[in-house]
Amino acid sequence: MSIFSDISNITSKKRKLEVPKPKTNLFVRGIVLFAFGLLGASVYTIEDIDKTPALIFLCIGAALIIAGIISLICYGKQVTAFKKYTPTWEKHRSIFDDFAIELNHWYDSDMRPRSCDGDTSYILRLQKDRMARKGIRMIQHTSPVKRETMGTTRVPRKTSWYTVDLMYEGVDRHLQFQNSTGTIYERVTEDTMYETVVHTPNEQELTRMSMTCPNCGAVSPVAALTEGCPYCRTVFRISDLFPRVTNIFFIRENASTKNQKKMGKTTGITMLVFFLACFIPSFLDRESPIPQALLMSFFVALIMGGIFGYIISIIIFMTKQFNRDGRKRIPFWSYVTTKGKVKSAFAPYDPYFSFEKFEGQIISLIRMAIMSDHPENLASYCGGTLNPYFQDIIEMTYMQAMTVQNIHMEGSHLCMTLRTWWINYSEKDGSINRRGDCIDVTLRRNTAYMEPPGFSITSAYCRNCGASFDSVRQRNCPYCGTVYHMENEGFIIERLELV
């Protein structure tokens, strides 16, 4: 399922590594020099050759072996330096970096992020509150991935209201869970971090565009906030209100450096096995000259060992990918056709529909419902009692795998059931369990209404009296008592089921 909607709009800001990646050609050169040196030195073992040429071959071979060892030592030093190096986010490089820094501070020192909206802050608070009740503390630290990449990629989408950017970059994510006894779980993964950023509002639409006041949380037109919030009187500039991160999520990176290293090790081990299997019998057979045995063994190891090693590593990798953590419950064909099915369903009703934004919204709704101790109070959740297992989940990582189970219309209401794939961390009796889960979610949305810009579940806008209130904690407007129907503003969850 591609994350891109329009390849021509994609831009990237490359990130420079202060400590360069180890040079692979240095390693290859060391191996080649060592192999040729060993081959040259082995000529000295041939009894039928004159001693003078034999000594020359021995000296040349020794020199090549020394040169190869020096190259391998230099490569080893580069590997050591690169292992010790950790890339860092750059403040004010972009809002992507700024929010990444704020997110790290949120987990290690409880400093509230300033670059995100109220809904994103609310989900982070839900997660932290649940862990606090369980006596768990999570330390999450992200840093730019330690390899050559495109850097921060931006996919912009301009609407009549503002511009929405989907920004993402590969990150090294260090997760650590602690309780009163110390660290009880630790894991380092390579993920892709996604941020949805709203910026550059259309000034002609400021009176119709609602936004949560960064100071008091009330919903007001953006134009009113620039003149002074009607509730707290704080005056904001447009630069104070935008840009704003409206969604954040992580997706596990399957083609990670760790997997590449495993494939390389598998290939290397297979080549070594082929080399030893060919050389040892030839060496024991005194009739075969050692140079001939070495040359034949090198050839077999390089060709046969390399090919078989690569095939074996691919088979192991693919088997793990399609069978691990519940992945087998996501049929491949359904997976690759999901984006087209969802876009086709929304095409007649929403000309501004973006699958990337939709995917991010669904991820947030699921996380909010599962992280909430009282999901029945959420205006976005209208289902029954959730699986008790959900109450133990303390961290969720979406695996960028979603399939359509059902799509149909009920009057003007679009109803769909999706299957989503997650890696969840749960706490039970003081221990952390990591497992893959497939979660089916049934959604409903009234297509007769367009989703308003700046829509926030934590600060909803009453269509009857115009007041703003927190729809997370109550379904009725506290001022006029009108029932709030969130399906007229966005999606609601009707069912959430663990598969």
Go through each PLM region and give its residues:
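N-terminal Lys/Arg-rich, disordered targeting/topogenic segments
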Residues: 1-21
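Short beta-strand edge/turn micro-motifs at domain boundaries
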Residues: 15-22, 75-79, 174-267, 317-333, ...
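Core segments of small alpha/beta cavity-forming domains
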Residues: 76-140, 235, 325-397, 463-464, ...
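Canonical alpha-helical transmembrane segments of integral membrane proteins
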Residues: 25-45, 57-66, 265-285, 299-304
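Structured, amphipathic secondary-structure segments that form assembly/contact surfaces
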Residues: 112-208, 367-368, 372-460, 469-476, ...
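Short, aromatic-rich membrane-interface segments at the entry and exit
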Residues: 50-57, 289-294
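Long, charge-rich boundary regions
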Residues: 77, 81, 102-105, 242-358, ...
